[in-house]
Amino acid sequence: MADSYDLTAIRNIGIMAHIDAGKTTTTERILFYSGRVHKMGEVDKGTATMDWMSQEQERGITITSAATACKWKGYFVNIIDTPGHVDFTVEVERSLRVLDGSIGIFCAVAGVQPQSETVWRQADRYHVPRIAYINKMDRVGADFFRVIEMIRKNLSSDAVAIQLPIGVEEAFSGIIDLIDFKAYIYEDESGEQYQERELNPDERSKAQEFRNLLLERLAEYDDSILEKYLEAREISPAEIRSSLRKSCISNQIVPVLCGSSFKNKGVQMLLDAVVSYLPSPLDIPAIEAMDIASGENVRIKPEVDAPLCALAFKLASDPYVGKLTYFRIYSGRIKAGSTLFNSRQDRKERFTRLLKMHANHREEIEEACAGDIVAGVGLKNTATGDTLCSENHLVLLETIDFPQPVIDVAIEAKTRADQERIEESLRRLAEEDPTFQTRQDKESGQMIISGMGELHLEIIIDRLLKEFKVNANIGKPQVAYKESVKKRTAAEVKFDRQAGGRGQYAHVVLEVLPLAEGQGKRFADKSSPEAIPREFIPAVEMGVREALQAGILGGYPVDDVEVVLKGGSYHEVDSNEPAFKIAASMALKEALENAQSVFLEPVMDLEIICPEEYLGDVISDLNARRGRIIALEENRDTKAVKGLVPLAETFGYATSLRSLTQGRASFSMKIKNFAEVPESKSREIIARRYGLPV
């Protein structure tokens, strides 16, 4: 058993893949073989330990990342099982931010799929070392070697087999270990027992070929391996493992394994690879933070006796303990009941309880240390991306960035009592999920909820109705348009109200500038303290930001703009914060009137897999939807169409594609960017928005 304070024996890993590649089934087998659970859960029966939400059990998919931990051969493994559906990519993003390594799971039939690419790029961004596991080797059409080629080509990764399958499809019966040069045959259904044997002549020939490929790849990065390889000297399994570990941790090589998690084959060897090749907290570069006192960047080393530094990466509601805050400890230690400092919020927080999570089950602990991932109860003001640290050593970690929502749904309470419950429920859900947002429509007064896709909002609404017991009328999904500007413009407003007694006075001059796509909203103060005292600047910014929530074309949020406060004036007696907030809001509205406002719409990356005989119809339909073809790729029996299409044109696409291809095509899509809406479509949006004839 590993001591949780022995950092060399800790592995913090994530499990990531496209939907239906077998992530949760693999996690269930890991928990069973490690002794963490005593019965295997099954996704299709709704009994998976990690899919504990009712919405996950009903749909057979993972919706929220679930944390657990197990022990394997003296190592302590923290595991986060992440969703594979594009609507829940935020769960992958925030998990990878705090993990040291990951397992990328690929279906042996489908290979690299669209969401496989998305999560792989996310792991690239955070420099997370990973191993690849080609699952479902028992399925008809399984091709281990084809999937390795896809990983190399589509993911630009140096994928190298360290195992070979024995048999394929129904004949898949075991695994060849290229490092130990042994065969392992599974004989019982549970997979708990497997027999080791020597390789037969045919297996030996194939294994030698791939072992040489492995050694050649290692020799590129390891001089000691290169020297022995060139001199034809024997290289021991221990030397290969040591070299492979270094190459994996430095993201030079991705070791590739195989198995069938559902048929209980290959999972124990996958666990061996996790502890052998993925890093401990000591093996990865120390994380950077800003020292608040000096303003300089410092490196936070994973030391138990150092000052505390931790990152809150996930919030969740628990029916028994209330708000749970998940966090990764980078240095120091935390005790239950201790007080710490939230440096982003600039306030103290106190833990009442510390918990080790196993999906939705809680294990109370007294202390947690550097390298660990735990949950805390009692943090009232901490949000996702906040830094928790010692009060005598204030540091700030880089926060976590999340994509903007792309789809809206109107929601309306059935009674006044439900209205209050809706507002509180939505606040809690938005606290948990940074890609879920709420706002009130200025025109209709309706509450608008926004998310990453139809399934995302469907799950949110289901939770509102079932978990929070809210009675509400739900509208149809709508595109979450944004507004922006194309022209630089300025406006000047004097707000002067005198109505007996003390008046209100504020004078502001604002300039509005367009920004490139994805730059968000910026506010800059270039006024002089003599024109506007510094204490009124936050009120000006607040007025600007509130006014940006509703543009002048259709009342949609304004984005990709910079608003600059150029100047103004004040009155020593009559000026106050509310006056400057009102003046700033009025000036911004006036500036937007002259800034050539436009609509921005979400554009989706679309990939369609279809038989060749339907290709013409699929492309014609895509063109009619304002789509643009980017690439056509050959698969074994199908064509892959990759393109861009506005989200507004994709509602009901699943039904249309089924009709066009007699149900023989599939598609997936994810947000690419926001782009300007053509003028003809803009007129349609305005007409629909205000109930005018289109």
From Swiss-Prot:
> Where along the chain is GTP bound?
17-24, 81-85, 135-138
Official protein name in the record: Elongation factor G 2
Keywords carried by this UniProt record: Cytoplasm, Elongation factor, GTP-binding, Nucleotide-binding, Protein biosynthesis
One MF annotation (Gene Ontology) recorded for this entry: GTPase activity
Q: Does the keyword Membrane apply?
A: no
Q: Which GO terms describe its biological process?
A: ribosome disassembly
Role this protein plays? Catalyzes the GTP-dependent ribosomal translocation step during translation elongation. During this step, the ribosome changes from the pre-translocational (PRE) to the post-translocational (POST) state as the newly formed A-site-bound peptidyl-tRNA and P-site-bound deacylated tRNA move to the P and E sites, respectively. Catalyzes the coordinated movement of the two tRNA molecules, the mRNA and conformational changes in the ribosome.
The entry's cellular-component GO terms read: cytoplasm
Q: Does the keyword Protein biosynthesis apply?
A: yes
Q: Name one Pfam family in it.
A: GTP_EFTU_D2
What superkingdom does the record give?
A: Bacteria
Query: Which InterPro entries does the record match to this protein?
Result: EFG_II (IPR041095), EFG_III (IPR009022), EFG_III/V (IPR035647), EFG_IV (IPR047872), EFG_V (IPR035649), EFG_V-like (IPR000640), EFTu-like_2 (IPR004161), G_TR_CS (IPR031157)
Q: Where in the cell is it found?
A: Cytoplasm
Family membership, please give it: Belongs to the TRAFAC class translation factor GTPase superfamily. Classic translation factor GTPase family. EF-G/EF-2 subfamily.
Q: Residue ranges of the tr-type G domain?
A: 8-282
